[in-house]
């Protein structure tokens, strides 16, 4: 594969095509299989839920399954239905091998393209990317099989691309299955949403989170697994980012800094700011701001609810929150501060 950044891949983690195992979403797979077994698989699926929870992994698993599995005629040698119970396809299956190599003719993946002049990914999926599908669907599917399209993410389409997709959904090609990944489905045209079958994936609990992170190549300290799950909010992608950029350490430092309020330890704050200075530390600055927003949101929520979160995301967090957000008014104050800081950071 190329060293170029991929729009559908979290930096430092395996691409979804390289993750044949899906963790924590058995119910979603069961819903798809039930539809498949009953012979009423919808031609377009909208996979929704927070970013990084496994939607793309499910899409690639489903694509692998659909291309590798011949259309069912609804009967076996003895005439009874033959229900399938898993989307698993062996790693040595020709389709699995071709997908890993990026050479499966029955699959087309649509993502934000790479801008050769700017040497970075474009900000949107353009109509030119959708036009590629005309040629893709114009080819005959091998052995009369299916053709699968993955759009990751559909939220990133510009208006022209969205309209081109809508026309395709209104008149779907024969044996075509479209898999749309969406982190924010409200951003999609209502007419696109209405022509898809929506399947929402939930966030992962601590145990599934640790298993999924380990499967993706990360290492989770059992002592910090609960804190990692709390900060990642059930997203494997977010958890991997936190692990690769010392997110737990950064959050612990933010908690310690907030604990010095209202005076605030200015030397400590300056040291944290200096650690984010320079273009080489842009990723760290982005994470610090994101985690500060999380900390302020937890303060605001605790004030509104009248109690600290059940799970501490850092040592001393419960004590800090109980002192700084003891009531509903303090919760509203922290929410207002979060809004001001967020506006200034943009």
Question: Which residues does each predicted region cover?
Answer:
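Charged, glycine-rich active-site and insertion segments that engage polyanionic ligands
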Residues: 1-65, 69-77, 81, 85-88, ...
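Conserved alpha-helical scaffold flanking the Walker A/P-loop in AAA+ ATPase domains
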Residues: 31-36, 93, 124-146, 156, ...
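A short hydrophobic beta-strand->loop->alpha-helix junction that borders the nucleotide-binding pocket
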Residues: 48, 109-114
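Flexible beta-alpha connector loops of hexameric P-loop NTPases
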Residues: 117-127, 154, 198
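Conserved catalytic/switch belt of AAA+ P-loop NTPases
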Residues: 138, 163-177
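Loop/turn-to-beta-strand initiation segments
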Residues: 143-148, 173-179
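Conserved Walker B
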Residues: 153-157, 169, 185
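Conserved D-loop-proximal element of ABC-family nucleotide-binding domains
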Residues: 159-160, 190
């Amino acid at each position: 594969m190329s060293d170029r950044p991929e729009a559908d891949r979290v930096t430092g983690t395996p691409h979804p095509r390289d993750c044949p195992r899906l963790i924590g979403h058995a119910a979603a797979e069961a819903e798809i299989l039930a539809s498949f077994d009953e012979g009423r698989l919808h031609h377009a699926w909208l996979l929704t839920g927070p970013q990084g929870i496994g939607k793309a992994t499910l899409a690639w698993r489903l694509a692998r399954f659909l291309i590798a599995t011949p259309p069912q005629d609804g009967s076996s040698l003895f005439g009874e239905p033959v229900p399938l119970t898993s989307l698993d396809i062996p790693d040595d299956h020709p389709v699995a091998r071709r997908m890993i190599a990026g050479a499966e003719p029955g699959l087309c993946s649509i993502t934000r393209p790479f801008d050769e002049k700017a040497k970075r990914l474009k900000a949107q999926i353009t109509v030119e990317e959708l036009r590629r599908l005309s040629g893709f669907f114009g080819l005959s599917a091998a052995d009369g099989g299916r053709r699968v399209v993955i759009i990751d993410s559909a939220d990133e389409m510009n208006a022209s691309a969205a309209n081109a997709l809508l026309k395709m959904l209104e008149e779907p090609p024969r044996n075509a299955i479209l898999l749309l990944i969406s982190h924010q489905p409200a951003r999609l045209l209502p007419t696109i949403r209405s022509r898809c079958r929506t399947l929402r994936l939930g966030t992962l609990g601590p145990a599934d989170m640790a298993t999924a992170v380990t499967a993706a190549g990360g290492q989770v300290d059992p002592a910090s697994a609960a804190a990692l799950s709390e900060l990642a909010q059930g997203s494997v992608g977010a958890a991997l980012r936190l692990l690769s950029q010392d997110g737990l350490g950064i959050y612990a430092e933010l908690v310690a800094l907030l604990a010095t309020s209202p005076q605030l330890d200015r030397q400590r704050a300056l040291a944290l700011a200096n650690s984010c200075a320079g273009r080489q530390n842009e990723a760290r600055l982005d994470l610090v701001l994101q985690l500060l927003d999380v900390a302020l949101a937890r303060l605001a929520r605790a004030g509104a609810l009248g109690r600290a979160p059940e799970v501490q995301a850092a040592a001393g967090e419960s004590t800090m929150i109980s002192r700084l957000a003891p009531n509903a008014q303090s919760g509203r104050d922290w929410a207002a501060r979060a809004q001001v800081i967020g506006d200034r950071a943009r």
